[in-house]
A protein has these predicted regions:
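Short intrinsically disordered, low-complexity coil segments enriched in acidic
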Residues: 2-3, 161
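Short active-site loop at a secondary-structure junction
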Residues: 3-21, 37-39
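Active-site SXXK
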Residues: 14-31, 50
Length: 161
């Protein structure tokens, strides 16, 4: 028996649930990530100092730093890290943004593949095309319109099921 409420084939924007596919595309295109760094690439984080250090380490391993990130700045959601930054007179930063792990992995793949790093969030960029290919491969779903997520990354419209 099949049952549903509403339209299970309605097109939605998957947003953060796409992070595993974005991480897969990054690794397939040369991002070398330890298990811990891969976990941060495939899921959001709270901006703890440990999380920021992991994203920074991915960037440093490719010769880049925080200035290469194209995600917004944010205050850490982790309270001890937030209050430490405030006490030190520091402002919000990109490494504290909850998608910085994913963005660091994106940049690692760009460096490994010889792709432009400035435009890594452009929907036509080879890395973003690889992300869309991974989404289609693993979901078996068609992709509709492309929107831009809050972190600046392209996000496809796709059916819920």
């Amino acid at each position: 028996m099949n049952a549903s409420l509403g339209n299970p084939e309605a097109m939605i924007y998957a947003r953060s649930s796409l992070k595993p596919f974005q991480a897969i595309a990054s690794v397939r295109n040369g991002a070398e990530l330890s298990d811990e760094r891969l976990a941060r690439a495939g899921a959001p984080h709270v901006g703890s100092q440990r999380h920021q250090d992991l994203a920074a380490a991915v960037l440093e391993s490719t010769g880049l730093d925080e200035s290469a990130l194209r995600c917004p700045t944010a205050w850490p959601q982790d309270e001890p890290t937030f209050f430490a930054r405030v006490r030190e007179g520091l402002d919000k930063n990109q490494l504290a943004f909850n998608c910085s792990g994913k963005h660091s992995a994106f940049l690692s793949a760009c460096v490994a593949s010889g792709w432009d790093q400035e435009s890594y969030l452009d929907p036509s960029h080879p890395l973003q095309q690889a992300v869309m290919d991974a989404v289609v491969e693993f979901s078996g779903s068609p992709i509709g319109n492309i929107a831009i997520d809050g972190c600046g990354a392209p996000v496809p419209q796709m059916p819920l099921v």
